[in-house]
Amino acid sequence: MGLAEHITRVWDDEIVDQLRTYITIPNISPAYEDRWEELGHMERAVALVRDWCAGRQIAGMTIEVQRLAGRTPLIVIDIPAFGDTASGNAADRTVLLYGHLDKQPEMTGWREGLGPWTPVIEE
């Protein structure tokens, strides 16, 4: 199987359903939803992402959810660098990715049968 076929298979078999589930979680940013902790949507989103990532077979990967009172959780995923580098130090291959799990408030104007928390794939 070539790289493009592998990516398509992983996308279709492992990612699309997770995205659909994520879309259904009305996890509004705490900047717009004072009751975000009480509602529990952030916890559902964190669990979804944490569990999906934990299911990947990546050597040496560790996953930790860090929490501070009154703040949104932080998922820290550490994957050690490996392989040769020009300096011989794998630590030179550090990459940092950052993202967030909260969403902006929903807007109006959706077509019939569509909405911000309803995943739809249109061909």
Predicted regions span which residues?
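Tryptophan-centered motif/residue detector
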Residues: W11, Y22, W36, W52, ...
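Active-site metal-coordination/substrate-binding segment of hydrolases
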Residues: T85-E123
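A non-catalytic alpha/beta surface segment that caps or lines the substrate-entry region
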Residues: Y32-D92, G115-P119
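N-terminal capping segment at the start of a domain
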Residues: G2-G40
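Short hydrophobic/aromatic-rich motifs at helix boundaries and adjacent loops
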Residues: D17-T24, F82, P116-I121
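Intrinsically disordered, low-complexity segments enriched in polar/charged residues with Gly/Pro
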Residues: T8, I15, R50-D51, T62-V65, ...
